[in-house]
């Protein structure tokens, strides 16, 4: 059985006080990779393997690091959020 994993950007945040204090460019602004509502559909088939290719560069490496274990679980058909979310196939990550 083959499974898919949909990733949806629920919202983005900018913490200007942290940017101003810690970044080399304090006016860097919001992340340029994602916008609220962006949706990505990942597949893992013999013809297409989005997981190991990080979606051919369409995904931020830092964000991928934060969610990849959940994506891998979903692509295998598993659920890791049993009794945590109202749908055990759904995960919300920051």
Where are these regions (language model features)?
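Short, Lys/Arg- and Gly-enriched loop/turn segments at beta-strand edges
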Residues: 47-60
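Short, flexible N-terminal segments of the mature chain
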Residues: 20-48
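Short, compact, well-ordered microdomains
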Residues: 61-94
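Short N-terminal binding/cap micro-motifs at the start of the first secondary-structure element
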Residues: 14-19
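A broadly conserved detector of short glycine/acidic/proline-rich loop/turn motifs that flank catalytic sites
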Residues: 11-13, 46
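Generic recognition of cysteine residues
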Residues: 5, 31-33, 60, 94
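A short beta-strand micro-motif
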Residues: 4-11
């Amino acid at each position: 059985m083959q499974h898919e994993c949909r990733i949806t950007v629920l919202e983005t945040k900018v913490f200007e006080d942290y940017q101003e204090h810690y970044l080399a460019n304090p006016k860097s602004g919001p992340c340029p990779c994602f916008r609220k509502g962006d949706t990505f559909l990942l597949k893992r088939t013999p013809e297409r393997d989005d997981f190991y290719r990080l979606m051919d560069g369409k995904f931020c490496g830092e964000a991928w690091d934060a969610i990849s274990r959940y994506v891998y679980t979903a692509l295998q058909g598993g659920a890791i959020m049993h009794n945590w979310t109202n749908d055990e196939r759904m995960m919300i990550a920051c």
